[in-house]
Swiss-Prot record:
Keyword rRNA-binding: yes
Protein name: Small ribosomal subunit protein uS5
Domain comment in the entry: The N-terminal domain interacts with the head of the 30S subunit; the C-terminal domain interacts with the body and contacts protein S4. The interaction surface between S4 and S5 is involved in control of translational fidelity.
Family of the protein in this entry: Belongs to the universal ribosomal protein uS5 family.
Protein's UniProt keywords contain GTP-binding: no
Length: 172
């Protein structure tokens, strides 16, 4: 198995992506000879224009785990349709016991979101949004619930195509 070298200072990629680390957990594997310590990292990567990806990485050292998570997040990026720095419409995302409600907001509102959700919207480029989380506050489940809700969001063009109308009729 190939070893991934930890990222050293100044070894920044010039791909224009924003990276945020959400959580690092210390994990322990108990074996016959004692305990083996490791680390698990949860990160999000975005381009500031609606693309977002989540990654998890595990390793014996924190920098290696974070780098693995960042690489996975880059590979799993999805495009979310934004409208003037906010969402198209209200959406609800669920994962496990975590339920996340996201509502578009007017200019000047800012990002009203807690914990892991704030990191997602900052790297994604959302500037005005109001969110509320219900149930589980586990960072992994909150991130997955947020991404679930963002994947459910549809553009006015998609809604118009489903209804057999023009975009102007949908927007009123």
């Amino acid at each position: 198995m190939a070893k991934i070298q930890p990222k050293v200072q100044g070894d920044e990629r010039d791909d224009g992506l924003r990276e945020k680390m959400i959580a690092v957990n210390r994990v322990t594997k108990v074996v016959k000879g004692g305990r083996i310590l490791g680390f698990a990292a949860l990160t999000v990567v975005g381009d500031g224009d609606g693309r977002i990806g989540m990654g998890k990485g595990k390793a014996k050292e924190v920098p290696v785990a974070v780098q693995k998570a960042m690489d996975e997040a880059r590979r799993k990026m999805v495009k979310v349709p934004l409208k003037n720095g906010t969402l198209q419409h209200e959406v609800v995302g669920k994962h496990g016991a975590a339920k996340v409600q996201m509502m578009p907001a007017k200019d000047g509102t800012g990002v009203i979101a807690g914990g892991p959700m704030r990191a997602i919207f900052e790297v994604m480029g959302v500037t005005n949004i109001v969110t509320k989380s219900h149930g589980s506050t586990n960072p992994y489940n909150m991130v997955r619930a947020t991404l679930d809700g963002l994947r459910k969001m549809s553009t006015p063009a998609e809604v118009a195509a489903k209804r057999g109308k023009s975009v102007e009729e949908i927007l009123g």
